[in-house]
A protein has these predicted regions:
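Catalytic/regulatory signature loops of cyclic-dinucleotide turnover enzymes
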Residues: 96-99, 103-104, 108, 125-145
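A short glycine-enriched loop-to-beta-strand structural element that forms part of the catalytic core
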Residues: 68, 72, 100-114
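Short, surface-exposed helix-loop/turn micro-motifs enriched in polar/charged residues
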Residues: 61, 80, 102-103, 117-118
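Short catalytic/ligand-binding loop motif for oxyanion handling, primarily in non-cytosolic enzymes
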Residues: 18, 114-115, 147-150
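Short, glycine/charged-enriched secondary-structure capping and boundary segments
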Residues: 23-26, 119-121, 155
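Intrinsically disordered, glycine/charged-rich C-terminal tails and inter-domain linkers
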Residues: 4, 136-260
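Catalytic NTP-binding/metal-coordinating core of nucleotidyl cyclase/transferase enzymes
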Residues: 1-86, 90, 97
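Catalytic-core segments of nucleotide cyclases and related cyclic-nucleotide turnover enzymes
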Residues: 82-85, 114-130
């Protein structure tokens, strides 16, 4: 058995420990509502990533255990980077809609990832990126992953077009790391981009406002980062919506979002 050259993403759902504790009442009884909520979140993730339909993703392996998700695919897979980043963004969107956030790291290297085994230097690197470098609710990667995606561009794309498509899913942060832009870039991934996006931003705003005042600095700093990514964008889209007629459904939806 030999390692394969693969690109791997390690995702961790933030605050999952507390959500699990909340699924058991003070009297020791199960909270059926909370357990059902957690199960629904994982159900949406499994559906998004085709975890239960491996025939739909022949080059991609996906493993989910507790609050962690690992996705990997051959580094040479045509269009693999773009497809993976799109899938990860959809996972982030579904988590937000359920009231959750995640953090992650994407690395390239030697890996064995089968339905029964998962190990290798690339896995260690992806986990290290998530746990020691991501810091905030973001999924980070460096230029090496972008370059790999361009080199293995989809057959219907020129390399320059593939690069443009990949960069369209990303933002570059102040520390130089690229991250998947699930704040301003999420609209096109929603079922009804025009109508669903105000609700999505409302959910993001609620997540931030409910946790940004945490007494734990390591928690509050995560939501302060997210607030910085959302606050100006929220003002921009709300101002744009005011160009619509009074009583317009979309205008009303944006105006219903409280400021941060």
């Amino acid at each position: 058995m030999n390692y394969k050259d693969r690109i791997v993403c390690f995702l961790d759902i933030l605050g999952f420990r507390e959500h699990v504790f909340d699924s058991v009442g003070a009297d020791g009884s199960d909270s059926v509502t909370k357990i059902s909520e957690l199960a629904a979140v994982f159900g949406r993730i499994r559906e998004t990533l085709d975890i239960d339909c491996p025939e739909n993703r022949p080059d991609t392996e996906v493993t989910q255990f507790s609050d962690s998700i690992v996705i990997s695919f051959p580094a040479y897979a045509e269009g693999g980077v773009f497809d993976a980043l799109s899938g990860i963004m959809r996972v982030q969107i579904n988590l937000v809609l359920g009231g959750y956030l995640c953090r992650g790291g994407i690395a390239r290297g030697r890996l064995i990832h089968t339905p029964t085994m998962l190990f290798g230097p690339a896995m260690v690197e992806a986990y290290t990126l998530e746990s020691q470098a991501a810091h905030y609710p973001r999924v980070i990667l460096d230029a090496e992953i972008i370059n790999a995606g361009v080199a293995a561009h989809a057959s219907h794309h020129l390399p320059s077009s593939e690069q443009q498509s990949i960069l369209g899913l990303l933002k570059r942060d102040l520390d130089g790391m690229y991250y998947i832009d699930y704040v301003t870039g999420a609209q096109s991934e929603l079922d009804d981009p025009e109508l669903d996006y105000p609700n999505y931003l409302f959910k993001l705003r609620d997540i931030i406002s409910s946790r940004i005042l945490s007494n734990n600095p390591s928690v509050s700093i995560k939501y302060k980062w997210l607030r910085e990514k959302l606050v100006d964008h929220l003002q921009t889209v709300k101002q744009s919506a005011r160009n619509r007629p009074q009583g317009d459904e979309i205008r009303d939806a944006y105006e219903s979002i409280p400021d941060l």
